Design a protein with these regions (language model features):
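Cytosolic, long alpha-helical scaffolding segments
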Residues: 1-97
Length: 97
């Protein structure tokens, strides 16, 4: 999940770097923003599977489970924030066209 978050941030940064030239000529902004959404969807699936796996192990240390779930939540929330930023960039582009 963390590597997907890093890739999503990199694609968002690339899209933002291209934003000033968007109106002057064609860029790959949309491609990068779609990749961010794809990473977020993949991250959602991994989050659900990982959370289920955490609670499926009846012998797991409850404190370790809580900590692991908190870490999963943090990464998922960060990915949601990156997707939200990408959606805002898409809205700005739509208004400019």
């Amino acid at each position: 999940m963390v590597s997907m978050l890093v890739y999503a941030c990199a694609d968002l940064k690339t899209a933002l770097d291209e934003l000033p030239t968007f109106l002057n000529h064609s860029t790959d902004i949309e491609k990068h923003l779609v990749k961010v959404q794809s990473y977020e969807s993949d991250c959602d699936r991994i989050y659900i599977d990982a959370a289920h796996a955490l609670y499926a192990d009846k012998d797991a240390d409850p404190q370790a489970v809580r900590l692991s779930h908190a870490l999963l939540d943090t990464v998922e929330e960060a990915m949601d924030s990156v997707e939200n930023a990408a959606e805002r960039v898409q809205a700005l582009i739509a208004q400019s066209v």
